[in-house]
């Protein structure tokens, strides 16, 4: 359980940094993310394992957006995030391109999914229902089909 909390804290910390438009690209490509990924046991495999299962979603936002709900393996997703980050840190011609809309969106989507997988689902209602109102706009004339 402690590991899941660490992964959740990592995901929320970094998704906040990627969402913040004032974040300098140096803060995103510096070694701190690598340190966090390695501490959690994520592997830098250039995205090969993730690509085998999800194709171009390893680097393309539109592709990832289509399959993100199918991703349930925390270590696989974490390794994909680490590998994508490493691309910008080491191989990209311009590391500042990590700030481009599509690249930033890829990280936000992947890190958000990692946060959901490792933490409590914020969309599940917990508590006691006090009142409910159901409204239907379905009009029917005659017997139900």
Task: State the predicted function of each range.
Residues 1-51:
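Short terminal alpha-helical segments
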Residues 14, 38, 44, 50, ...:
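Polar low-complexity intrinsically disordered regions enriched in Ser/Thr and small residues
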Residues 19, 35, 41, 54-55, ...:
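Short, flexible coil/linker elements and helix-boundary hinge sites characteristic
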């Amino acid at each position: 359980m402690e590991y899941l909390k660490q992964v959740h804290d990592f995901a929320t910390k970094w998704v906040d940094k990627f969402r913040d438009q004032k974040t300098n690209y140096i803060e995103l490509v510096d070694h701190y993310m690598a340190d966090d990924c390695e501490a959690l046991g994520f592997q830098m495999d250039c995205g090969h394992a993730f690509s085998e299962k999800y194709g171009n979603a390893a680097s393309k936002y539109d592709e990832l957006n289509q399959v993100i709900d199918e991703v349930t393996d925390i270590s696989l997703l974490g390794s994909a995030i680490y590998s994508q980050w490493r691309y910008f840190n080491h191989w990209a011609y311009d590391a500042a391109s990590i700030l481009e809309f599509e690249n930033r969106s890829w990280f936000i989507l992947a890190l958000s999914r990692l946060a959901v997988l490792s933490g409590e689902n914020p969309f599940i209602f917990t508590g006691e229902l006090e009142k409910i109102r159901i409204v239907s706009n379905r009009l029917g004339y005659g017997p139900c089909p």
